[in-house]
Amino acid sequence: MKKTVLAMGALALTLSFGAHAQISDGVVKVGILTDMSGPYSAMGGRGSVVASQMAVEDCLKAECKGMKIEILSADHLNKADIAASKAREWLDRDKVDAIADLTNSSVALSVQKLMKDKGGIAMFSGPATTRLTNEDCSPNGFHWMFDTYSQAAGTAAALTKLGQKSWYFVTVDYAFGHSLEKDASDVVKRNGGTVVGAVRHPLNASDFSSFLVQAQGSKAQVIGLANGGADTVSAIKQAREFRIGSGKDQRLAALLVFLSDVHALGLETAQGLVYADGFYWDYDDRSRAFAKRFEALNKGAKPTMVQAGVYSSVYHYLKSVAAAKSDDSKIVAQKMRELPIKDAVMNNASIRPDGRVIHDMYLVQVKTPAESKGAWDYLKVLSTIPADQAFKTMDTAACNLVKK
């Protein structure tokens, strides 16, 4: 398949074992709307399409026997208007039933509103904003894997409790970055720390030197990177180059790191980073078996938590359609909340009324080159953050689906 088709068109994969009588148009269609060419493409992108295909294959062998399922994919170019336009086209012209991945918080919020108004299931494994399960929650929107609170609760809480009390943030200037900075700031303050300042940078920035120098000049004990993907990689590389945040009086903390980021940085540069992750391929036998299948289809790359989340969300959606014997979004959304989430990716997982999927998270640390035993052996799990502690509780939620 040509890259232009993957990037701007719709990649269709139809896997069928005959039609399913209860499906409205005879086929269940899932769209993977992701970043195929920008700063988040390594953590999602083509790998998210691969993960969705694996979910289809697995469900057809089990709960989905006899169903016809089609996967579509497109590049949203990290633009909310393009994402909304493609999602609307899928819903109106292609009769897509569900959309997954949706990396980029601005993209996710635009599609959440559209799907809420027009119907259809939205499954978010790539964006981080907590607005998806608060003021912008939807009865047919589900937030998988992580959010800004889970990342702050893991990284910021761990470092603050170790005595790293004063923080300065380098923040990407859009909804995701603002949310990540706010949640991390709240966690720091709740644990007795202070925030001395912040500076914001554009998405996909190439030069972080001025932002990092400002952060260094703050004399804060921790420079917190409230960004993700290629921005995180670039910021860490440039910080190491200028020896910023590498001394005993000031350290660098990345609040959202993916396995693909560690791979891009290399262990020599990334070693010692501590962060929260929702999936690690070498965690147990199930995750290792899943990763082995995935890498064979994804040019040897192990899955990130975004890609693992696409697999889990698409599989759970499909088996919910099968159990409901319907692709009606209201019926399927209810069934998704009823059924347990059991797959090779998630541990101790369930869906709350606000659409937040809660599950165990892991506090991990990047290994040194000497500790690594081979390709992609990058992380060691320091501790498990239980599902009921990893995510913000609903008692302060701004979601109108939550009864108080």
Question: How would you name each of these model-derived features?
Answer:
Residues 1-29, 398-404:
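Short, low-complexity disordered leader/linker segments with a strong preference
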Residues 23, 27, 42, 46-48, ...:
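Beta-alpha junction/loop-to-helix N-cap segments that form part of ligand/metal-binding clefts
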Residues 24-53, 74-81, 103-104, 170-178, ...:
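Extracytoplasmic "Venus flytrap"
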Residues 28, 340, 344-404:
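Solvent-exposed, acidic/polar segments of extracytosolic/periplasmic ligand-binding ectodomains
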Residues 76, 130, 203-204, 245-266, ...:
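Venus flytrap/periplasmic-binding-protein-like
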Residues 85, 130-131, 138-242, 279-289:
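Extracellular/periplasmic Venus flytrap/periplasmic-binding protein
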Residues 90, 94-103, 123-125, 168-171, ...:
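Periplasmic-binding protein-like
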Residues 236-312, 321-327, 370, 377-403:
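Extracellular/periplasmic periplasmic-binding protein-like sensory domains
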